[in-house]
A protein has these predicted regions:
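Ribonuclease/tRNase effector modules and their secretory precursors
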Residues: 1-80
């Protein structure tokens, strides 16, 4: 997994770690295409009891950013 500088900055801001990103991506997660950026994907999953979203480049290897899941993403996760 490649993590760009912006993602590291956001990880620190949001108390998210590279280990948490690996746990989410390599565990059970949902992938969906980003509505805002068609060349990016969003991985949605649960880490440490919280639902997170990781934005990935189209190679599904490069992490752009991570954030707590939006409400619609949480609903999608719970309805899987």
């Amino acid at each position: 997994m490649k993590i760009i500088k912006h993602a590291f900055e956001k990880f620190d801001e949001r108390t998210f770690t590279p280990e948490m990103a690996a746990k989410l991506v390599h565990g059970r997660c949902l992938f969906r295409r980003s509505n805002s950026f068609p060349d990016r994907y969003i991985a949605i999953g649960e880490v440490d009891g919280k639902i997170w979203s990781i934005v990935l480049e189209k190679d599904l290897y490069t992490v752009v950013t991570a954030r707590r899941a939006h409400k619609d993403e949480e609903n999608l996760w719970h309805s899987r």
